[in-house]
Each structure stands twice: as structure tokens, then as C-alpha cells.
Amino acid sequence: MTQKTALAALLLIPSFSFAATVLSAPPELNNKSYVLMDYETGQILASKNENEKLAPASMTKMMTSYIIEQKLLSGELTEDEQVRMNESAWCRGSSSESCMYVPLNGTATALEMLRGIIIQSGNDASKAMAEHIAGNEGTFAHMMNQEAKRIGMTNTSFVNSTGMPAEGHYSTAKDMAMLAQHIIKDSSKYYPIYSEKEFTFNGIKQGNRNALL
């Protein structure tokens, strides 16, 4: 699963702050729903169907990574903490999903897993971290929903940590923009990872799934 989705063309530009009058009309994009937000003020500069509930696909991993980052910053996790790849999280190399390719029963550090999620969009890394933090993915999804509620994501429901299609798993462009704003603000130590263009693990080099880089 890639991060290309009909949910949002999500552009948050922390190094610029400009008034809404800069945009005389919303840009013409093919996306079903999008939001352009000023990071510093939270002002929505342009949008289309920003409150429409859609499947967030791999953008789900923004919340997965946000929770991991907050656990690292609070000391509940350490960067060098070893995380095991159980069979329930292990990626078998299917072409239908993106993977970090941690070997079955192998380990990676929490920081490596975070990079595997952010850069490689690894479903295996997302599920392994969910199990490591919460015991199972379902309990982790509950944590995701609690965090979404805390930061004001009122039209979001998470069922899993990866964004794989599931009934009741949805979000909106506006909610995801709000989450992105919190990642930049609350996880400033780890935010530079989002701009890293590639990551190599287990001898496998993969490029960042973010097509804007």
C-alpha cells in the first residue's frame, strides 16, 4: 500500500506563514478531498471536501508514528529498545503491501522501526510496534482513537495501525491535517525523519514513499 490516496493532498509548510489572501481561488486538484493548512496558525488556506470521511490508507501510519514518537519522548520507549517481529506482524513479501522486511522472529530497534514506518511505510513495522506497545493491534487501535480524540480529530476512527482496508476505518483531510500539525509541533525531535529520502535495513534500501520529496 502506498501513501497515494484520495483522502488528501496534504501540504503543511512550517517554514512559511502567509495570509489566506495569497490564494485567490482553491487550486484545481484531482484529489477527492484535500486541505492546505498554515502550520503556524492552523488556518485552512484552501480545501475541498475537507470533512468527507474516506479511507486514509497508509496515512494511518501518521498516527502510528506519532504515538511511537510520544512514547520515545516520554521515556516509555527507548530508541535502542529491541522490538521483535512476531508472525502476526511479519511481512511475507506480498506485492499488495509495503514492508520494512524485518525477518520473522528477528528484531530491530524502536528507532529503526520508526524509520521503517515513516520512510518505507512498512506494514510489518507498524504492526510490530503496535504489538510491542499495546500487546496486540486491536488495543493499539484503541490507543490511536483515544489520541485522535485528544487532539480534536472528531471525524476519525482507526481499526488498525497500517491503514489496510477495514470496515469502520476512516478519517478526513481536515483531521489528518490536524494530526500533521501535531507531529510537527509535538515530535520536533523526530520530524526530520519524514524528509529522509531513503532507509536501508537488512541490506534492503528503499526510498521514501512520500512523492513530494
What are the functions of these language-model segments?
Residues 1-7:
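Bacterial N-terminal signal peptides that target proteins for export
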Residues 7-8, 65:
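Short amphipathic alpha-helical "recognition" segments used for binding
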Residues 10-11, 68:
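Enrichment for repetitive, rod-forming helical segments
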Residues 11-20:
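Hydrophobic h-region of N-terminal signal peptides that target proteins for export
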Residues 20-174, 181-185:
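Active-site-adjacent loops and short helices of periplasmic peptidoglycan-processing enzymes
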Residues 153-154, 165-213:
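Domain-terminus/edge residues, biased toward the C-terminal soluble/receptor-binding domains
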